[in-house]
Every structure is written in structure tokens, then in C-alpha cells.
A protein has these predicted regions:
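Residues at secondary-structure transition points
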Residues: 64-67, 147
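Conserved beta-hairpin
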Residues: 74-110
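A membrane-cytosol interface segment of integral membrane proteins
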Residues: 129-168
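Short secondary-structure junctions
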Residues: 25, 116-117, 166
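Acidic/histidine-enriched, beta-strand-rich ligand/metal-binding domains
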Residues: 32, 90-94, 101-105, 119, ...
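N-terminal membrane-targeting/pre-transmembrane regions
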Residues: 1-63
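Single-pass alpha-helical transmembrane signal-anchor segments
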Residues: 39-49, 70-85
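Acidic, Ser/Thr-rich low-complexity segments on the non-lumenal side of membrane proteins
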Residues: 92, 107-144
Length: 168
């Protein structure tokens, strides 16, 4: 398969390739985990408060016991979904390529289609540069991780130097 065919094939089908080799690099964001914890505390506090106060005074509407438990129940559902979404992002790499798992999807890119990792100044997260000026945000590398993200980016760039094809 030529490089052009590989590029077209990988771009057209998100499940076109994957790697069976062991991963040499893996990164997640401790900052997003902290954001998730704070968000869940706020969501649950608001929903517990609403569940407690919904029936305190008579407003003309009938408020049943189930209504009082519905607010915290909705808060639990929102909290679980938030936790799953914010702790999901991950970046993995090996000699075959890079796997990016963001909030909504996972995608594998072979080294042949990657132009590098960049972290634009003022940006909240890094991104993988792709052909035709496209890029994929990498939620696993957040600027909120401060010194930790610098170490992770340097480690990733070491793999880039080892596996990315050289320009002709």
C-alpha cells in the first residue's frame, strides 16, 4: 500500500488501523481529574439543595416525595457522565503510531500521517498536527498540569524523533 493510499484509508475510516504492539508512552491529565471532582461536588451540592428545598413552601404545585428524590437522582446521573467524560482522555504511542482518546472518540494515527505534536502559546491543550493543516486536540495534555505536561510533551517528542519518518 502506498503512502497516499494509507493516508486516504486512514482518513476515511476511523477504525482502519490499530496497534497490537505494547504501548511505550501513555499520558492522562491529573488536572482534568481535579476539574471532574470539583464539578461533581458543585453539581451534587446544587441538586441536593434543590431536592431539599423543592417542597419547603407551598407554591400551588403538587410536590411529591418522588420529586424530592428526582433532583439528587438527576445530579447523580450528571455526575457519573461528567466523571466518565473528564477522566477518559488519554494519549498512547508506540512504534506503529499514536492513539488519541478524547471525550467522544478514540482514533489511531500511524506515524506516516503525523507532522508532530504542538502546544500553541495560550492554548489549554496540545494537538497532533496532521496533513493539510488539520489537527486533533489532545485532551490528555492540558496546560493546567503545569510542569507535569512539560515532562510528558518531552517524552512524546523523544518518541517522535525515534519513529516519525524524516522529511525528504
Amino acid at each position: 500500500m502506498s503512502e497516499e493510499q494509507l493516508l486516504a484509508y486512514t482518513s476515511a475510516d476511523p477504525f482502519a488501523q490499530t496497534s497490537s504492539k505494547p504501548w511505550e508512552y501513555e499520558a492522562t491529565s491529573p488536572y482534568l481529574r481535579k476539574v471532574a471532582i470539583i464539578w461533581i461536588i458543585l453539581v451534587m451540592a446544587a441538586h441536593l439543595f434543590m431536592g431539599f428545598t423543592v417542597g419547603l413552601s407551598f407554591t400551588g404545585a403538587t410536590v411529591t416525595t418522588i420529586d424530592k428524590f428526582a433532583f439528587p437522582g438527576v445530579g447523580v446521573v450528571i455526575s457519573i457522565l461528567s466523571w466518565l467524560a473528564l477522566t477518559r482522555p488519554r494519549l498512547r504511542a508506540n512504534s506503529d503510531g499514536v492513539e488519541i482518546r478524547n471525550i467522544l472518540g478514540t482514533r489511531f494515527y500511524p506515524w506516516q500521517v503525523i507532522y508532530g505534536l504542538s502546544f500553541p502559546e495560550g492554548s489549554r491543550m496540545a494537538r497532533i498536527e496532521l496533513p493539510d493543516f488539520e489537527y486533533v486536540p489532545v485532551w490528555a495534555l492540558q496546560s493546567g498540569d503545569k510542569q507535569n505536561v512539560i515532562t510528558k510533551v518531552r517524552s512524546f517528542r523523544d518518541l517522535e524523533a525515534r519513529y516519525m519518518p524524516q522529511d525528504d
